[in-house]
Amino acid sequence: MAKFDAHLKCSFCGKSQDQVRKLIAGPGVYICDECIDLCNEILDEELIDTQAKINNSPQVKKKLPTNNSDKSIPLELTSIPKPLEIKTFLDNQVVGQESAKKILSVAVYNHYKRLAWRLKEENKENDSNDLQATKLQKSNILLIGPTGSGKTLLAQTLAEFLDVPFAVADATSLTEAGYVGEDVENILLRLLQKSEMNVDLAQKGIIYIDEIDKIARKSENPSITRDVSGEGVQQALLKMLEGTIANVPPQGGRKHPNHDCIQIDTSQILFICGGAFIGLEDIVQKRLGKNSIGFTTNPDESKINAKKIIDSRDALKNLEQDDLVKYGLIPEFIGRIPVCAVLDRLSKETLESILTEPRDALVKQFKTLLSMDNVELNFEPESVEAIANEAFKRKTGARALRSIIEELMLDLMYTLPSQEEVKEFIITKKMVDKLFLSKIVKLPAGSQRIIKESA
């Protein structure tokens, strides 16, 4: 047996077992430690060459992380947009929600001032009074409102107005580290991409996290089982919301110990979280109902609470942090979002205004579309009211408006491109009441289009 072992040799270099330190056996093959080292050197050289080619390519050169700021942040107080100016811009695109717009305007204004103050402190010469300088901390914002009330639209409109990077993320795809899904650091990667991979600029940005209510834990009490997409995500977001040095993988996905990460300081990034929080008003109503029960309750106070309970739309105006805890948010997470804005449910009158008043109103959009076919589109006031009433019944907010108009305009937009002689079209209330029951009758060129209702 010893004689057989003496004839073992490396299948690659041919050296015998006595000539090498280690000989590793495989299925019918042997390799020595020297050949293993040589293979590792070859792989390392190829990896370096490949990485160099990637880094030298024009596409990647533009996306490499940098600390040089290309965009100018307002540094003087006089150049910072005032809250009234920010709200005026929001008014042009978002109808209603006055309280939420006021809160967002003040928060963005303070965000600009905090950046200017920090830069001013950094430019000061170091002296003995530096330790006494006031440190300005950020106040993250929580937007609560029913679906279609304008939470995402407010965030998108702010993105148009701001000179700082603005990124929108979805909380539903986030999971705790180590599980299938996105890490919370991928939120910062979106902001970094919006900043054209400029780290210094990204650290001054704003992030809007949508559907934040979807990461609420299943019950108020801590669970003994893993909640990887609920409480686990809240725990992972804590330090990011408060301010920390986060390691972000430049290519996205999961972090790898052998891959380089980009470090981003989140202490100056403003986070705005939004969610519908379906069922939260029931928790508030239940609490208000308990307060109005008992022999020692003030009768006048009981009447006030009873009125609050009747209208669920007003229930969220009495929201407290304990209600959010019962909904499923952990106290530590709520504490890091001190500012809370509640958006109102859209009324019929507000829906009518949304159809016609904003810059990108649906009526204006469809008028523009039909003008490309040389057709003038008009809506009777009664038809706008009927569309708003139908949208209000569907209880999906402003999103129902587009669905209704798309249904209403489908047949019309199907036939319009082929009817070059028609120059004008009027949407009437009867058409809204009887969707898809109208027929288009061809008329001589230059005349107004007539709608013939079917029986």
Curated annotation (Swiss-Prot):
The gene is clpX. GO terms for cellular component: HslUV protease complex. GO terms for biological process: cell division; proteolysis involved in protein catabolic process. It comes from Prochlorococcus marinus subsp. pastoris (strain CCMP1986 / NIES-2087 / MED4). PANTHER family: ATP-DEPENDENT CLP PROTEASE ATP-BINDING SUBUNIT CLPX-LIKE, MITOCHONDRIAL, ATP-DEPENDENT CLP PROTEASE ATP-BINDING SUBUNIT CLPX-LIKE, MITOCHONDRIAL-RELATED. Component of the ClpX-ClpP complex. Forms a hexameric ring that, in the presence of ATP, binds to fourteen ClpP subunits assembled into a disk-like structure with a central cavity, resembling the structure of eukaryotic proteasomes. One of its GO terms (molecular function) is ATP hydrolysis activity. Belongs to the ClpX chaperone family. ATP-dependent specificity component of the Clp protease. It directs the protease to specific substrates. Can perform chaperone functions in the absence of ClpP. Zn(2+) binds at residues 10, 13, 32, 35. This is ATP-dependent Clp protease ATP-binding subunit ClpX. Residues 1-51 form the ClpX-type ZB domain. SUPFAM superfamilies: Glucocorticoid receptor-like (DNA-binding domain), P-loop containing nucleoside triphosphate hydrolases. CDD domains: RecA-like_ClpX. Keywords: ATP-binding, Chaperone, Metal-binding, Nucleotide-binding, Zinc. ATP binds at residues 146-153.
